[in-house]
């Protein structure tokens, strides 16, 4: 058996890859999808770098990987935030903001993105 590595990424997508973005086989990514790995602390005193010159505003940044497993379909305009895994064969509805990992074999939508349905009778490709 041979490995299949098909991936389709439509136009105007943004991948901010300060860390790994792993995309599995047979993944469909619609247009205007944004995937971010960079993030900042929510605490202002942890965000700003101390003892830097006044003319420079420097923020501490860290990055978390994003993983999109095999068979995933990501609808148009979806935003995927740092540290998220989207499980095998799942579908993310258009316009969703994925703030937490999504399990395999489900449909998830919204802001924040939530599972609304399990997908049964999956045929692997």
What does each of the following model-derived ranges do?
Residues 27, 46-48, 98-99, 104, ...:
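Short, intrinsically disordered/low-complexity patches at protein termini
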Residues 35-46:
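Proline-centered turn/helix-capping motifs that create local helix->coil transitions or kinks
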Residues 6-11, 16-25, 30-31, 36-37, ...:
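Left-handed beta-helix
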């Amino acid at each position: 058996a041979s490995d299949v590595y098909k991936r389709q990424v439509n136009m105007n997508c943004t991948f901010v890859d300060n860390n790994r973005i792993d995309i599995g086989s047979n993944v469909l990514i619609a247009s205007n999808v944004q995937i971010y790995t960079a993030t900042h602390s929510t605490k202002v005193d942890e965000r700003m770098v101390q003892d830097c010159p006044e003319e420079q505003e420097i923020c501490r940044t860290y990055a978390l990987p994003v993983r999109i497993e095999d068979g995933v379909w990501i609808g148009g305009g979806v935003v995927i935030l740092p540290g998220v895994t989207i499980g095998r064969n799942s579908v993310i509805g258009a316009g969703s903001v994925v703030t937490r990992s999504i399990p395999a074999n489900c449909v998830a939508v919204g802001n924040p993105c939530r599972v609304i349905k399990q997908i049964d009778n999956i045929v692997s490709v």
